[in-house]
């Protein structure tokens, strides 16, 4: 997707337009042709989608649809990246909150999927790309940096439309216990998916 912040976002994850392929890589039509060509060769196609954060160059940053569209704090608050707070029953609530509401960087606002309209925006975004490009799967960037209930609702929204669709969440963990917590979570932890 389009990232208009190459100075701050060398990696392309500060999205400015979720519905446009970054022109450095081509166009929407070229992307759709690439997926079709892959399918002709029997290759499945998985797209990366980032529901956790966008970029400050996105139009909504200066004209938020709702004040709680993004997580806001009195001063800039970076995520502490303490994802273990999800699975550790002894973790401090403040650590988990800092993980799931803190911004990734000063140019990457943290989206609030707890806002039902923001959640629906991201569900419809995924549905649109699946249908437009004929995707076979989605890799969900920074999956555990969003509240479990919210990312679960996003996942359920997509699977409601496409029950057999492949979703793979990125979880940067370095030990078996933390990875296992997120593995096959379709019925674990009170319905978390």
Named regions from a protein language model:
Residues 35, 39, 53, 61, ...:
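Active-site-proximal helices and loops of the catalytic beta/alpha 8
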Residues 2-36, 65-112:
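Aromatic- and acidic-residue-enriched carbohydrate-binding clefts of CAZyme catalytic domains
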Residues 1, 17-20, 44-51, 137-140, ...:
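Structural recognition of the beta-strand scaffold that forms the well-ordered cores
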Residues 4-9, 49-50, 56-63, 178-181:
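Short, solvent-exposed loop/turn and secondary-structure capping segments
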Residues 69, 102-116, 143-157:
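Active-site cleft segment of glycoside hydrolase catalytic domains centered on the general acid/base Glu
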Residues 12, 25-29, 116, 120-123, ...:
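Conserved structured core elements
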Residues 30-45, 49, 59-83, 88-89, ...:
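An active-site-proximal structural segment forming one wall of the substrate-binding cleft
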């Amino acid at each position: 997707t389009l990232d208009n912040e190459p100075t701050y976002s060398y990696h392309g994850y500060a999205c400015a337009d979720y519905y446009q392929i970054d022109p450095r890589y081509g166009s929407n039509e070229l992307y759709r042709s690439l997926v079709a060509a892959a399918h002709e060769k029997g290759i499945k196609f998985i797209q990366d989608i980032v529901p956790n954060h966008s970029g400050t160059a996105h139009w909504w940053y200066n004209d938020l649809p709702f004040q709680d569209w993004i997580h806001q704090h009195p001063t800039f608050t970076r995520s502490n990246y303490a994802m273990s707070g999800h699975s550790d029953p002894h973790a401090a609530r403040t650590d988990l909150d800092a993980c799931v509401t803190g911004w990734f960087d000063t140019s990457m606002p943290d989206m609030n999927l707890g806002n039902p309209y923001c959640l629906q925006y991201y569900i419809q975004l995924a549905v649109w790309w699946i249908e437009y490009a004929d995707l076979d799967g989605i890799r969900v960037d920074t999956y555990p940096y969003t509240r479990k209930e919210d990312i679960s609702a996003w996942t359920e929204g997509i699977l409601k439309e496409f029950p057999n669709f492949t979703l793979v969440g990125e979880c940067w963990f370095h030990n078996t216990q933390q990875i296992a917590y997120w593995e096959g979570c379709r019925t674990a932890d009170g319905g978390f998916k």
